[in-house]
């Protein structure tokens, strides 16, 4: 047995800045200029979208290059006419640029201990390790707010500790067969963009007043994970395996919305929302902020297979295959109400229920080629979506894709090699939709079609 201990310290710093016009006001149209000079006709919208009959497929769109030249905006200066100040300002710009200014410092301290063993039990080789890690996370974040022409630096801090035990055991019950078990408590810190106390606040007289603020007090994503796999190494460089896994996500991060009066916003964070004459205490705002929510369980299995076909005759012995299939079921609780006291259960965002990859390859040392296929099932990207549904809970997601790639290379000499690679040979498009959990509505809101890509190359070693 071997006993190990250690310590670690890491410090990260992230800074952001931005520059923008002080106002979005535009000057009067220059003399001798018409609307036609500043616009163009956008045509051909809706291809491959199956739009209903009568849908608009063309409209007038602004010509940004023409507008910049006509108004002199490309000078990035103050032209001296009303609305013609095109200077890009930073912190002194209290209306449109402050949201881009932020700095975050994260300090991570850790201590760990681990016991490794490699022994036998009932004649079977057994190896593994058991250990635990203590980690402390200290976060300091700062952003800016501007009210009544006064720019205020808004700061926040958070500090949390985690104890993360882990256990890994590998048993070889018979030759070339491995049974592996793993259990661990894991954590993943929230992204920097969720922590910054940067304020976004609509105008006091806006029809629908909104406010948003980062949340430096977020806890990390936390989960308990369990994995069990059976692996059979049935031939040289060959593997057939089956694995099951379970993850209990106990802490999740979701952006929530709730109705709050300005007085409640001030009480919550007086630095970000100071009392102001043009902000009546009773005015109601829709307040958005990242929030910790309960999470939920995730279960699934994975099948993997790889084998070179060395048992085949002649050139066929240079063939081989690699393939895997994963199925996942998850039940994540997403907050759906203003007070965050009601939830809807749906799949984990950005995770496909089914996915598989397969590669057929040939390699004789001088010539190699491979064809790969990758399938990904439909998955959610946001639950609930920003725009509410009329029949159910609105969600956004991405439709299923099947992509096929191929490549080949040939060593002409020891120094010269030629290659060709084809990407997205099935001409798959990126289609994202806005739908509802009941499946009634399916509206495309993103359709990107990049087409097939082919690359030809040559490499020479001197």
Specify the residue positions occupied by each region the protein language model found.
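Surface-exposed extracellular loop regions of Gram-negative outer-membrane beta-barrel proteins
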Residues: 1-6, 108-172, 223, 322
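Transmembrane beta-strands of outer-membrane beta-barrel pores
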Residues: 7-15, 119, 132-140, 183-189, ...
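Flexible glycine-rich, low-complexity coil/linker segments exposed to the extracellular/periplasmic environment
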Residues: 19-100, 259-291
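Extracellular loop and loop/strand-boundary signature of outer-membrane beta-barrel proteins
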Residues: 96-102, 147-156, 211-216, 286-292, ...
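Gram-negative outer-membrane beta-barrel transporters
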Residues: 246-248, 266-385, 426
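C-terminal beta-signal and adjacent terminal beta-strands/loops
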Residues: 250, 375-387, 409-462
């Amino acid at each position: 047995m071997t006993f190990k201990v250690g310590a670690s310290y890491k410090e990260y710093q992230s800074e952001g800045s931005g520059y923008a016009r002080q106002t979005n006001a535009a000057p009067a149209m220059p003399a001798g200029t018409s609307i036609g000079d500043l616009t163009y006709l956008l045509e051909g919208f809706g291809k491959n979208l199956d739009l209903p009959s009568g849908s608009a497929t063309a409209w007038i769109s602004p010509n940004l290059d023409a507008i910049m030249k006509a108004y002199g905006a490309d000078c990035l200066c103050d032209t001296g006419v009303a609305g013609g100040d095109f200077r890009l300002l930073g912190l002194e710009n209290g209306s449109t640029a402050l949201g881009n200014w932020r700095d975050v410092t994260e300090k991570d301290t850790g201590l760990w201990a681990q016991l490794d063993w490699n022994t036998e039990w009932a004649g079977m080789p057994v190896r593994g390790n058991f250990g635990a890690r203590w980690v402390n996370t200290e976060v300091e974040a700062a952003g800016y707010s501007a009210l009544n022409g006064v720019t205020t630096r808004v700061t926040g801090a958070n500090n949390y500790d985690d104890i993360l035990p882990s256990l890994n055991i590998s048993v070889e019950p018979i030759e070339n067969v491995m049974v592996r078990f793993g259990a661990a408590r894991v954590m993943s810190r929230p992204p920097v963009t969720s922590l910054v106390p940067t304020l976004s606040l609509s105008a006091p007289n806006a029809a629908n007043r909104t406010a948003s603020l980062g949340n430096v007090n977020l806890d990390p994503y936390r989960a308990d994970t369990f994995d069990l796999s059976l692996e059979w190494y049935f031939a040289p460089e060959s593997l057939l395996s089956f694995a099951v896994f379970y993850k209990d996500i106990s802490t999740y991060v979701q952006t929530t919305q709730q109705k709050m009066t300005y007085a409640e916003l001030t009480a919550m964070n007086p630095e970000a929302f100071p009392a102001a004459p043009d902000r009546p205490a009773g005015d109601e705002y829709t307040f958005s902020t990242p929030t910790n929510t309960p999470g939920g369980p995730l279960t699934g299995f994975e099948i993997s297979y790889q084998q070179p076909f060395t048992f085949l005759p002649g050139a066929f012995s240079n063939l081989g295959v690699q393939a895997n299939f994963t199925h996942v079921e998850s039940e994540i609780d997403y907050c759906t109400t203003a007070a965050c006291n009601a939830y809807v259960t749906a799949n984990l965002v950005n995770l496909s229920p089914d996915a598989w990859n397969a590669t057929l390859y040939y390699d004789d040392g001088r010539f190699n080629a491979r064809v790969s296929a990758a399938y990904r099932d439909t998955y959610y990207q946001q639950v609930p979506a920003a725009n509410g549904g009329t029949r159910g809970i609105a969600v956004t997601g991405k439709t299923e894709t099947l992509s096929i790639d191929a490549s080949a290379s040939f060593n002409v000499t020891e120094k010269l090699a030629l290659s060709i690679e084809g990407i997205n040979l099935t001409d798959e498009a990126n289609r994202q939709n806005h739908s509802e959990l009941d499946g009634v509505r399916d509206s495309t809101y993103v359709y990107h079609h990049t087409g097939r890509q082919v690359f030809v190359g040559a490499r020479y070693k001197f």
